[in-house]
Amino acid sequence: MQISILEQSVSVEGKPQSNTIQDSINLAIKAEILGYKRFWVSEHHNHPTIIGSAPEVLMAAIASKTETIRIGSAGIMLPHYAPFKVAEQFRVLAALAPGRID
């Protein structure tokens, strides 16, 4: 059975947001070690505790620290972006981590 993780980068009060992002990256590393198939990141805006507002940036950071796990965005809020720009971002991600970006 193939198992994946959906990470929302939930911040804890009093904890620096940089730690939350690092925790998300560390979770992806552990998921890869444990044999998970895919690591999904989410996109949320204007939420007091979910700080995952730029999935393409977090995906690049995760790709740079892992080797085999597939990395995907659980959704892109296309009304906020030019679709061509999103396609270009994911093309760059695919070049950084060939065969691992969803």
Question: Which sequence ranges carry the predicted segments?
Answer:
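Generic, well-ordered alpha-helical segments
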Residues: I50-A54, L78, K85
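Flexible, glycine-rich active-site loops centered on histidine and acidic residues
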Residues: Q2-Q17, H80-D102
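A short, GP-enriched loop/loop-strand-helix hinge that lies immediately N-terminal to
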Residues: R70-A74, I101-D102
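Active-site nucleophile and cofactor-binding loops and adjacent substrate-binding regions
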Residues: S73-Y81
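N-terminal beta1-alpha1-beta2 module of alpha/beta enzyme domains
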Residues: M1-G72
